[in-house]
Amino acid sequence: MQIILLDKVANLGSLGDQVNVKPGYARNYLVPQGKAVPATKKNIEFFEARRAELEANLANVLATAEARAEKINALGSVTIASKAGDEGKLFGSVGTRDIADAVTAAGVEVSKSEVRLPNGVLRTIGEHEVNFQVHSDVFAKLNVNIVAEA
């Protein structure tokens, strides 16, 4: 299925690219999320007429994401208290939702889908470096300090 991208999509392309994707991916994800439209003659003409407006909107979103990434980097570190055993292992784990809630409580709005844990959930006490993907092009890093609850 031919589509026109309205936003940058990982592994596909950027604004204005006409790409061929599987129909289910287009129907169930790209079109409902507002990231693409089917490449009909009407949509191609409509896109070309609004191209400057869409590019300005995309630049605005990117600037907002960069500002949020700077705020995350400025935090330095966030402390999360969790129940732990004697050897420093947690009862359970600290996942993306816990980290997103802690960062949001510290003053920077972050959703759990923006938190990247390459080695899986955190299961030990101590300092852990966590990556955030605020936008497809914008990344931030933050130290998460996990301490045992008293």
From Swiss-Prot:
GO biological process terms, semicolon-separated? translation
Gene3D superfamilies (UniProt xref): Ribosomal protein L9, C-terminal domain (3.10.430.100), Ribosomal protein L9, N-terminal domain (3.40.5.10)
Output one GO MF annotation: rRNA binding
Q: Please tell me whether the keyword Iron is annotated for this protein.
A: no
Q: Which residues form a coiled coil?
A: none
Q: Which InterPro entries match?
A: Ribosomal_bL9, Ribosomal_bL9/RNase_H1_N, Ribosomal_bL9_bac/chp, Ribosomal_bL9_C, Ribosomal_bL9_C_sf, Ribosomal_bL9_N, Ribosomal_bL9_N_sf
Which keywords has UniProt assigned to this entry?
Answer: Ribonucleoprotein, Ribosomal protein, RNA-binding, rRNA-binding
Q: What does this protein do?
A: Binds to the 23S rRNA.
Spell out the protein name for this chain. Large ribosomal subunit protein bL9
